[in-house]
Amino acid sequence: MSAIAPGMILFAYLCGSISSAILVCRIAGLPDPRESGSGNPGATNVLRIGGKGAAVAVLIFDILKGMLPVWGAYALGVTPFWLGLIAIAACLGHIWPVFFGFKGGKGVATAFGAIAPIGWDLTGVMAGTWLLTVLLSGYSSLGAIVSALIAPFYVWWFKPQFTFPVSMLSCLILLRHHDNIQRLWRRQETKIWTKLKKKRQKD
């Protein structure tokens, strides 16, 4: 156990450091997501600058790079505390990727993937919370913030032994969204539908 957990933490960070948004945009001939749209290399920004196909590819890869290290560690019998650190390491890799100049995304999809191995029931509830919030508000960032706030309570209900590590993960996501929280408070955050309409008008 003592040797497996630190090794999985390093593996998770390196997996997280593979920025799928940047790679997909390069392969598809799209602008660098760090320099276009919102400047965030994540699925939402790729949706704005490249459309649904590219965004779905980024979303899937970002989820997998959080899911695979945690699932592997879970299968190896790593304890919940270490699983939390492994999940955080994957998100830290996404946020500060060593392969891309430490300029990454906000870690939402990767965090979702890291939580998924806890159970499909929890995964469905989390996805539903994010989707409902976005549909009602139009803010992708608000969906992430609300999901991060509620996630520890969901986990406590389904599998309480994972409440602490998921709480650590939620804190990381909320800290990463501090600029979005300020813009939402000032009513300066742009709705995702507005940005998509602007893109269609340009096209």
Swiss-Prot record:
Native source species: Salmonella typhimurium (strain LT2 / SGSC1412 / ATCC 700720)
Predominant place of localization: membrane
Membrane topology qualifier: Multi-pass membrane protein
Location within or outside the cell: Cell inner membrane
Matches recorded under InterPro entries: G3P_acylTferase_PlsY
Family from the record: Belongs to the PlsY family.
Function recorded in the entry: Catalyzes the transfer of an acyl group from acyl-ACP to glycerol-3-phosphate (G3P) to form lysophosphatidic acid (LPA). This enzyme can also utilize acyl-CoA as fatty acyl donor, but not acyl-PO(4).
Disulphide-bonded residues: none
Keyword Aminoacyl-tRNA synthetase attached: no
Topological domains, Cytoplasmic: 25-52, 102-111, 159-203
Example of a GO biological process term: phospholipid biosynthetic process
Catalytic activity: sn-glycerol 3-phosphate + an acyl-CoA = a 1-acyl-sn-glycero-3-phosphate + CoA; a fatty acyl-[ACP] + sn-glycerol 3-phosphate = a 1-acyl-sn-glycero-3-phosphate + holo-[ACP]
Subunit structure comment from the entry: Probably interacts with PlsX.
EC number(s) recorded for this UniProt protein: 2.3.1.15, 2.3.1.n5
GO MF term list: acyl-phosphate glycerol-3-phosphate acyltransferase activity; glycerol-3-phosphate O-acyltransferase activity
Gene name of the encoded protein: plsY
Gene Ontology CC terms: plasma membrane
Name of protein: Glycerol-3-phosphate acyltransferase
